[in-house]
């Protein structure tokens, strides 16, 4: 019929009047939009279609007088909860007990958000609007909450802990508002039969039996505890912490306003203590592990530092943990072997045959003149076949070492020394004593093919930090003073440390009975060497099995500061820092040992062979 553009069109403002009936589509949209509004009489008249809608509660303005507007607070609280994949409306939460606008802040966060906080008979609802446009809302059951006021804070605030990712801090505008919130929260929680306030919590256990976040108690009582500063490298911040040493673990706590807060636990079998670091600080040591960042511990005083070293050495020795690295560099320390070779700083090699040897003048330079390894009695009952086989094995080792000594570089020697002792893949209960001796703090570095052990087969996974707190800290000061006054555990090793303040005596004057420890001076060294020449070489006596403990000298190859003896018999570090004299003289002065007769069968076959 032609183009439609040829038909005259009515003006745009009059075009709507030509339609025969209004559009029904717009009316449907308007009615559906009105039915999804706020809950009230209009929503109730919408029928079944409005009942299936999901509503969100939007809090209004601040309510000045709750008594006058009580009828408005009894409206149902509608929200959305997920039940599987479908969403269902929530039941009515009841009347609003208290309502106010406060500020919300999570612990360890500086962001403060305006929050609408509403208290229902059994729930606490909050909706916070962040500065970046984010909205935080949550519905918390009162039976799972713990409310604690912040006494030492300048702000009128209280803390809420419960099923939250972090404790929640509620900042009130005034002290009166804070008191009202605490009153209503405590009242509603008491009506529900749940936990009340922090001060009415059940009493905690003693400080020596602290529970950790993993839910188990550390084995045994606390061995050592003190206030230290912890630095998580490579960060530079230092934190005040309470470090507690148990027989099998290290526990870390922080002193908060409401008590002690658990921070973490480190099993001693998964970490090792490093006493030698490049940037060594005074009174500090490192806690290292394969799955943690290195932690630097800075003690408060020299006495505290020495007490920690004594306790750590005793506990690691008792538990069979790796020895303290760098322990042999301290004056008076001993090195124990198990039938293996060790390299001294002078490039010499010593082979221990499993029994004790008299002191020699060719002691490693890593020890000062005033300290030598002590002697401990051992049996020498062996058959001639065993003696011949041991001598043959020693000869083969000496030949192999001569062949490979010229081709080995100092770096390879250092790598050979850096390997730890070999531990069997299956622990034998009958060999626990020998394993504890081999892994003691006085043991040297051994060359081995594999350094894996069942102690490290299961890597350490730090437990999730929970909100376990110790609120009753009335005995904390007494507990710390008792830990400081205690001298620490006595090492269970049959090889005690050698004191450095006892005068030197003639080794030949020792009897088979108990006697005091002795030290080696220049004169004693010459006498012992003459006695060694008089008795002959080690081939005249039956050597001991290679797995028996033996005291030899050991030092790290390429040490930047070798322990060369000075004219006054002190080490270079001692001359620089006189505090070490007092520390180690006091630490190692309580050792007692047995000195066998040099002419007896105990020492007849235990001579150290030098190449």
From Swiss-Prot:
SMART domains: PH. Transmembrane segments: none annotated. Residues 96-192, 222-319 form the PH domain. It is a lipid-anchor. A lipid is attached at residue 2 (N-myristoyl glycine). Keywords: Cell membrane, Lipoprotein, Membrane, Mitochondrion, Myristate, Phosphoprotein, Repeat. The keyword Thylakoid does not apply. Found in a complex with cytochrome c mRNA and various ribosomal proteins. Interacts with C1QBP. Interacts with ELAVL1. Interacts with BID. Both PH domains are essential for its mitochondrial localization. Controls the stability of the leptin mRNA harboring an AU-rich element (ARE) in its 3' UTR, in cooperation with the RNA stabilizer ELAVL1. Decreases the stability of the leptin mRNA by antagonizing the function of ELAVL1 by inducing its atypical recruitment from the nucleus to the cytosol. Binds to cardiolipin (CL), phosphatidic acid (PA), phosphatidylinositol 4-phosphate (PtdIns(4)P) and phosphatidylserine (PS). Promotes apoptosis by enhancing BAX-BAK hetero-oligomerization via interaction with BID in colon cancer cells. This is Pleckstrin homology domain-containing family N member 1. It comes from Homo sapiens.
